[in-house]
């Protein structure tokens, strides 16, 4: 599993799995390096690999409502700013289903 931070800032352009990776944060740089190392290792061992680039993960215990109640919020007020979020249970379902519909070399 990786993260969407590997894409970096695309200045408002639409980002897909096929978009260029140009991370700007240390987390994004580290995750892209890890992706490349895993890919290299799997190629060397002739194994198949799928990469899942996850966005902001939330759960019933960790979400905006919980943070609002606790007073632990960060307000971001930018015009046309969007967030990409995914629930932890959706991640579990996707990973489970990927075992049966494996697509070697795919990035999701």
Residue ranges and their predicted role:
Residues 1-4, 52-54:
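SDR active-site strand-loop-helix element
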Residues 47-66:
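Flexible, glycine-rich beta-alpha linker
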Residues 11-51, 76:
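Catalytic helix-loop patch of NAD(P)-dependent Rossmann-fold dehydrogenases
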Residues 23-28, 55-57, 78-86:
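Glycine-rich "substrate-gating" loop/helix at the edge of Rossmann-like oxidoreductase active sites
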């Amino acid at each position: 599993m990786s993260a969407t931070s590997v894409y970096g800032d695309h200045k408002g352009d639409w980002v897909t799995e096929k978009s260029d990776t140009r991370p700007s944060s240390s987390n994004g740089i580290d995750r892209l390096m890890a992706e490349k190392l895993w890919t290299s290792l799997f190629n060397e061992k002739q194994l198949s690999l799928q990469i899942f680039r996850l966005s902001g993960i939330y759960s019933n215990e960790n979400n905006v409502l919980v943070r609002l109640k606790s007073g632990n919020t960060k307000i971001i007020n930018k015009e046309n700013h969007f967030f990409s979020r995914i629930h932890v249970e959706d991640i579990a379902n996707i990973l489970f289903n990927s075992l049966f519909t494996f697509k070697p070399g795919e990035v999701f």
